[in-house]
Curated annotation (Swiss-Prot):
Cofactor comment text: Binds 1 pyruvoyl group covalently per subunit.
UniProt pathway: Phospholipid metabolism; phosphatidylethanolamine biosynthesis; phosphatidylethanolamine from CDP-diacylglycerol: step 2/2
Protein name: Phosphatidylserine decarboxylase proenzyme
UniProt record similarity statement: Belongs to the phosphatidylserine decarboxylase family. PSD-A subfamily.
Entry function: Catalyzes the formation of phosphatidylethanolamine (PtdEtn) from phosphatidylserine (PtdSer).
Species: Rhodococcus jostii (strain RHA1)
Pyruvic acid (Ser) modified-residue sites: 206
Length: 237
């Protein structure tokens, strides 16, 4: 994202202030859920500062966690009826499947796009459409590798149903993976989420499934890389 120009007459910052300003503009902010994972190794680095290997290892760990929990700014498209990717990653499946039973969306298969997130991807989840949250259901389960087809059915998951102003129901499901053992969902029933708004996070490798109403035109392709909140993956009927 480009930095905003400085208005005329604005007092110029000091060289140190200017450097800090540049860093803030270039480095993505950190999701709050990542703070403990960054602060803990930083504390170890401080306590073990006299031992070079401890200090370096702890700082490396803190940097890796900061990269994992990064929360970059995104600009969703301003078009009616589009569905954006709820996560960064690779499209693993473009098919039809029965939505999670806990969402009460029926037993008929609906269009689905599954996105697999590696440990190197941004791991926050964003609302694929703008709408009201009508259901949020967490279901315990297994921790199979998230790229397996069975993961949607047997792994731990958090399912959320959104009702758009146009009357469509879109479901987005956070699925835990082999390393992902903690699903965070900040959205609650009754909340209204703008398209692309961050609502949750899955720690360390995961998958996100999106279910659409019948008649939706799927635009995503298997193997495609997605950018959460920006890549259009479907057009609602």
């Amino acid at each position: 994202m480009a930095r905003k120009p400085t208005p005329p007459g604005t007092q110029q910052p000091t060289s140190v202030g200017h450097i800090l300003d540049l860093v803030r503009g270039a480095v993505p902010p950190l999701h709050p859920a990542g703070l403990p994972f960054v602060l803990a190794p930083l504390g170890v680095a401080v306590l073990g500062r006299k031992r070079k290997w401890v200090r370096r290892g702890a700082l490396t760990s803190a940097a890796a966690c900061a990269a994992f929990f990064r929360h970059p700014h995104r600009v969703p498209p301003n078009r009616v009826g589009v569905v954006v990717a709820p996560a960064d990653g690779e499209v693993a499946l473009v098919d039809s499947a029965v939505p999670p039973a806990e969402l009460d969306m029926g037993t008929e298969p609906l269009p689905r796009v599954s996105i697999f997130l590696s440990v190197l991807d941004v791991h926050v989840q964003r609302s694929p459409v703008g709408g009201e949250v009508t259901k949020v259901v967490h279901r315990p389960g297994q921790f199979l590798s998230a790229d397996l087809a069975d993961a949607s059915e047997v792994n731990e998951r958090n399912s959320m149903l959104l009702h758009t102003p146009e009357g469509h129901d879109v479901a987005v499901v956070q699925i835990a993976g082999l390393l992902a053992r903690r699903i965070v969902c900040d959205a609650k029933v009754g909340d209204t989420l703008p398209i692309g708004d961050t609502y949750g996070l899955i720690r360390f490798g995961s998958r996100v499934d999106t279910y659409f109403p019948a008649g939706t035109t799927l635009l995503a392709e298997r193997g495609q890389r997605t950018i959460g909140a920006e890549t259009v993956i479907a057009q609602l009927p």
